[in-house]
């Protein structure tokens, strides 16, 4: 192979001569532009570049393992503790020569170990064989001896077996009888002891009560004890109260009334044991009859806490959680307060909070999923169809005004960019194009910073990302963001270097800048294809399509064509005549007109389908974008679209999703309100800009809401009172009037009834078609609500030369104005040795015994400081004024 010059090699590598010379210098080879390069020097350069662009020298892997440990605590409760074990391992990349040496050493060591292992196995095999032979001989001898013993013992065993069984049964029976008698004796002694103690205590109580109630002279002491029996049960306490009332009311009628007669109406509130105790309490004194009937407590407190399996759904109230754990609601509230959360008994809490509380109280938690119906509906699908090749879904991404839509226009031979407001894309456009080599579906995403979520949705729904970079502008912020979205979705990237026909185009600069973010061209050893195109001149369009189809062929994209369809919502909006309209990209199956679809919170039957050209179609296969009509509402962009069999079940699932979303949202709102309670109490007055937002499509509503909420500061907050898709209605105008909000319409207009309300209420209605203008005007409105910044500006300095006494003003400072101008009634500071010792107001300013309003630089004057007489020679009087600076939101 002949040597080539530096210039020739630079042309082959499509790089500048200076850069190539610098790369040779970095590799340790000094060359000039006209020098020749040998094959060995080329290889040295390639090795240097590969080493420079190689991966990191050190790789650290971290692993976390979580487990739960039940620890017993005081009170018999057990507490579940979450344990996290963290492991860390670092791999260091070795030098190639060092790696080869270590590999050779390891190989030699493995061979030596293998040789030693084989020798040990052979030795062990020989020993095992010898041992087996010895054991076989011994075994034969033992078996012969044992056979003889068994024959002799068999005869004795048959005769003695029956005698042994009889003896064992008799011994076991005697032992059980002895144990039963012992237990019975102990139980009788314990019961007798308790009855004697109870009887003594009851008699003592009766005597004491009889002495206190001297008016019951005719009653016997034993009858007194029945009236004032120890109140060990609910029935006995009620009987005692009844007896007291009867005695108090019937003192004049007689003393022999039966005082402790229970009422029959109270039997529903007591147990059988309570009624027996009450009867014993009433009749306990008559000859000792039924004295020891049943004074023992029936309920025994558990020795330790009972741990239950608590089943928790996605949301639960505090009261329901307490019932599941069989505790009082106040205990659950106390446990939540210990965890730092305030709650009421009827408050709805989320699953995570309920799980923490239940585990803190020592119970085992079982998390329940409440979407069984949803899973059943989604799993009831056609299966078994074979996968077929499908068209690739390609997303065009890049910075704003880099020519994404214009590039797509040339491919589609239409003029879409001219129809976009301000010439920038503000929706996701979905189109499919037929080429000579096959069909390609394109998604065009907006490049403005506000449409981050739209670009992320585009990357998630795609197979290949075409990254459009202007050759004259290079890599910009949204270009970097598009690269991040593509990497997050693990989608291959094809780079289209646009505007290549401009004289200031520099494609090498684009390659170098993209290489910093991991996008390397194939000629540099990377995986990304770079295609130079011009959307205006049409240069390189065919090469771009070939590159896309080549990448799709490598990916081997397949999908099931027959069966129930599934896909994703790319965009959605509310049409005045057609109702909710959703742009759907079919991923699998075939979507037919009349199918029942479930789409996020919405459902419905497909009444009509149109392609991107507005033509009616009856079906749409994989990778085909269509607009569908017939949904119950406007779905959120990014929702999954699924064809289901039963419309009733689809409606139930949609309603369940709406209810679940609302419950989770309310639980989070309540939690945030309680958490921010003290912050809201301490913060000052905050101005709010209320906005009612209406836009033409769901994606624009989402993007504008995010952008406006990010403008909020500590002093001025943006509050989206209401938002939606479609024109401005009378309801929107009424809401804006009630909340003193600004009405914002993005690519929509107000209807006649709304305009009447707007005129009557003098509402602020603003129309926009470009998102830049909307954000700038809201920012200006917020800036007007900011309090101005106060700044002190020094306007003059005066040096005290002498001090005079005045009967009217006290000490007067004779001064020379050294800088600026001194004005009357301005605030001043008195400085001594460059330290402020007094701050006040200039009360008197005279020149030649005349009052003046100001004295300029270089003139003498007399200054009287208000309420300050400690002016000395050498002090400096600093005169300043306070100016207001209007602040703006950055």
Swiss-Prot record:
Residue positions binding GTP: 398-405, 444-448, 498-501
Biased composition (Polar residues): 67-81
Modified residues (N6-acetyllysine): 808
Region spans: G1: 398-405
Descriptive protein name: Translation initiation factor IF-2
Compartment annotation: Cytoplasm
Region (G2), start-end ranges: 423-427
Family, per entry: Belongs to the TRAFAC class translation factor GTPase superfamily. Classic translation factor GTPase family. IF-2 subfamily.
Chief place where the protein resides: cytoplasm
Domain of life: Bacteria
PANTHER family: TR-TYPE G DOMAIN-CONTAINING PROTEIN, TRANSLATION INITIATION FACTOR IF-2-RELATED
Database matches in Pfam families: EF-G_D2, GTP_EFTU, GTP_EFTU_D2, IF-2, IF2_assoc, IF2_N
Species this protein is from: Shigella dysenteriae serotype 1 (strain Sd197)
HAMAP family for this protein: IF_2_B
GO molecular-function terms, A-Z: GTP binding; GTPase activity; guanosine tetraphosphate binding; translation initiation factor activity
Bias-annotated ranges (Basic and acidic residues): 92-217, 267-280
Region Disordered, residue ranges: 45-302
Region feature (G4): 498-501
């Amino acid at each position: 192979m002949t040597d080539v010059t530096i210039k020739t090699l630079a042309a082959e590598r499509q790089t500048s001569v200076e850069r190539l010379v610098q790369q040779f210098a970095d590799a340790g080879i000094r060359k000039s532009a006209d020098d020749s390069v040998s094959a060995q020097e080329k290889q040295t350069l390639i090795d240097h570049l590969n080493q420079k662009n190689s991966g990191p020298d050190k790789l650290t892997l971290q692993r976390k393992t979580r487990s739960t440990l039940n620890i017993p605590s005081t009170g018999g409760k057990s507490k579940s503790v979450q344990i996290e074990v963290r492991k860390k391992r670092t791999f260091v990349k070795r030098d190639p020569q060092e790696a080869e040496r270590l590999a050779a050493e390891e190989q030699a060591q493995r061979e030596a170990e293998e040789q030693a292992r084989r020798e040990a196995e052979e030795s062990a095999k020989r020993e095992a064989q010898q041992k087996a032979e010895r054991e076989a001989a011994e075994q034969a001898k033992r078996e012969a001896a044992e056979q003889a013993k068994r024959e002799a013992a068999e005869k004795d065993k048959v005769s003695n077996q029956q005698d042994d069984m009889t003896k064992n049964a008799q011994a076991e029976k005697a032992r059980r009888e002895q144990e039963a008698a012992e237990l019975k004796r102990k139980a009788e002694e314990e019961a007798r002891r308790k009855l004697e103690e109870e009887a003594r205590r009851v008699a003592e109580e009766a005597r004491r009560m009889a002495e206190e109630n001297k008016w019951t002279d005719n009653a016997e002491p034993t009858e007194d004890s029945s009236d004032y029996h120890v109140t060990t049960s609910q029935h006995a306490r009620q009987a005692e109260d009844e007896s007291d009332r009867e005695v108090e009311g019937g003192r004049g009628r007689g003393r022999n009334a039966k005082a402790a007669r229970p009422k029959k109406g109270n039997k529903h509130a007591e147990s059988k044991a309570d009624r027996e105790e009450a009867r014993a309490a009433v009749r306990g004194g008559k000859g000792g009859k039924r004295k020891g009937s049943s004074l023992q407590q029936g309920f025994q407190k558990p020795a330790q806490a009972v741990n239950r399996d608590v089943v928790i759904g996605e949301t639960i109230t505090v009261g329901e959680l307490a019932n599941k754990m069989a505790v009082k609601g106040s205990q659950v509230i106390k446990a939540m307060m210990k965890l730092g959360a305030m709650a009421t008994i009827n408050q709805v809490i989320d699953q995570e909070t309920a799980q923490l509380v239940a585990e803190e109280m020592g119970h085992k938690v079982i998390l329940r999923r409440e979407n069984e119906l949803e899973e059943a509906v989604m799993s009831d699908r056609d299966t078994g169809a074979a996968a077929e090749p499908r068209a690739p879904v390609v997303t065009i991404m890049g910075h704003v005004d880099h020519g994404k839509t214009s590039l797509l226009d040339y491919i589609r031979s239409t003029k879409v960019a001219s129809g976009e407001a301000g010439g920038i894309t503000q929706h996701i456009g979905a189109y499919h194009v037929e080429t000579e080599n096959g069909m390609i579906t394109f998604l065009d995403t907006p490049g403005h910073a506000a449409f981050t979520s739209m670009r992320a949705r585009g990357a998630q729904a795609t197979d290949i990302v075409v990254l459009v970079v202007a050759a004259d502008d290079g890599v910009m912020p949204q270009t970097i963001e598009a690269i991040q979205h593509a990497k997050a979705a693990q989608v291959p990237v094809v780079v289209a270097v646009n505007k290549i026909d401009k004289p200031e185009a520099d494609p090498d600069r684009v390659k170098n800048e993209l290489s910093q973010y991991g996008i390397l061209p194939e000629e540099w050893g990377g995986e990304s294809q770079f295609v130079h195109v011009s959307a205006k001149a049409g240069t390189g369009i065919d090469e771009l399509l070939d590159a896309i189809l080549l990448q799709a062929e490598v990916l081997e994209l397949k999908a099931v064509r027959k069966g129930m369809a599934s896909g994703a919502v790319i965009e959605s909006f509310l049409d005045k005549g057609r109702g909710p309209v959703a742009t759907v990209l079919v991923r699998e199956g075939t979507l037919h007109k009349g199918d029942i679809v479930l789409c996020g919170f919405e459902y419905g039957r497909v009444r009509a389908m149109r392609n991107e050209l507005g033509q009616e179609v009856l079906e749409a296969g994989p990778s085909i974008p269509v607009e569908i009509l017939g949904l119950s509402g406007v779905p959120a962009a990014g929702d999954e679209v699924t064809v289901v069999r039963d419309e009733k079940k689809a409606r139930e699932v949609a309603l369940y999703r709406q209810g679940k979303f609302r419950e989770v949202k309310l639980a989070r709102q309540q939690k945030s309100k309680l958490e921010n309670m003290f912050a809201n109490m301490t913060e000052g007055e905050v101005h709010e800009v209320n906005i009612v937002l209406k836009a033409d499509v769901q994606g624009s509503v989402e993007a504008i809401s995010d952008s406006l909420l990010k403008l909020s500061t500590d002093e001025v907050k943006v509050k989206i009172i209401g938002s939606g898709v479609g024109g401005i209605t009378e309801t929107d105008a009424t809401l804006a009037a009630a909340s003193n909000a600004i009405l914002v319409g993005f690519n929509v207009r107000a209807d006649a009834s709304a305009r009447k309300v707007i005129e009557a209420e003098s509402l602020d209605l603003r129309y926009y078609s470009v998102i830049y203008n909307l954000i700038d005007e809201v920012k200006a409105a917020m800036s007007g609500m900011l309090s101005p910044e106060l700044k002190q500006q020094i306007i003059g300095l005066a040096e005290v030369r002498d001090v005079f006494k005045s009967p009217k003003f006290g000490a007067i400072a004779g001064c020379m104005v050294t800088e600026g101008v001194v004005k009357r009634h301005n605030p001043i500071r008195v400085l001594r040795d460059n330290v402020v010792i007094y701050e006040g107001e200039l009360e008197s300013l005279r020149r030649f015994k005349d009052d003046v309003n100001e004295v300029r630089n270089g003139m003498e004057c007399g200054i009287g400081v208000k309420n300050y007489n400690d002016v000395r020679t050498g002090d400096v009087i600093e005169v300043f004024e306070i100016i207001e600076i209007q602040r703006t939101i950055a």
